[in-house]
Each structure stands twice: as structure tokens, then as C-alpha cells.
């Protein structure tokens, strides 16, 4: 799955 974290998806 795609999760946006620390500016990265």
C-alpha cells in the first residue's frame, strides 16, 4: 500500500 510519510509516498 502507499502511505505518505516524511514527504515520501
Swiss-Prot record:
Post-translational modification note: Forms a cyclic peptide with subunit A (PhTD-1). An additional intersubunit disulfide bond is formed.
Subunit structure: PhTD-1 is a cyclic heterodimer composed of subunits A and B; disulfide-linked.
Keyword Kinase: no
Disulfide bond sites: 4-9
Gene Ontology biological process terms from the UniProt entry: defense response to bacterium; defense response to fungus; killing of cells of another organism
Listed name of the protein: Theta defensin subunit B
Annotated family: Belongs to the alpha-defensin family. Theta subfamily.
Cross-link Cyclopeptide (Cys-Arg) (interchain with R-1 in subunit A): residue positions: 9
Positions of crosslink type Cyclopeptide (Arg-Cys) (interchain with C-9 in subunit A): 1
The keyword Ribosomal protein is annotated on this UniProt entry: no
UniProt keyword annotations, A-Z: Antibiotic, Antimicrobial, Defensin, Disulfide bond, Fungicide
Coiled coil regions, renumbered to chain: none
Source organism (scientific name): Papio hamadryas
Protein role: PhTD-1 has antimicrobial activity. In low salt conditions PhTD-1 has antibacterial activity against the Gram-negative bacterium E.coli ML35p (MIC=1.5 uM), the Gram-positive bacteria L.monocytogenes EGD (MIC=1.6 uM) and methicillin-resistant S.aureus ATCC 33591 (MIC=2.5 uM), and the fungus C.albicans 820 (MIC=1.6 uM). At high physiological salt concentrations the antimicrobial activity of PhTD-1 decreases slightly: E.coli ML35p (MIC=2.0 uM), L.monocytogenes EGD (MIC=1.7 uM), S.aureus ATCC 33591 (MIC=3.6 uM), and C.albicans 820 (MIC=6.5 uM).
